């Protein structure tokens, strides 16, 4: 998978329904690859969505995928600000998980 490690939820899906998991991963790769919008920005968009929908671990993991795709700390900082603008303080509290040190 080009975007980094496979998230735990996909690993669980792979164990229970490998064929469907492959479909999900194929679609994910197609959508998140470089195109008119560079992959790192698409990944930052997913981080914003995770912040707004209150997924702190996902936000941290996606931020690390964005870094691996070439996103700078300044870009991650601005994505956190966008999450706050559209999701309010709860999204900000979740979004700051993007600053967790990568493992």
Describe each model-derived feature in a short phrase.
Residues 1-43, 64-68, 94-103:
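Acidic, glycine/proline-rich low-complexity segments that act as flexible tails and inter-domain linkers
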Residues 26, 48, 82-85:
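Residues within well-ordered alpha-helical secondary structure of globular protein domains
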Residues 42-56:
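Amphipathic, charged-and-aliphatic alpha-helical interface segments
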Residues 74-101:
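C-terminal structural segments of small proteins and small subunits
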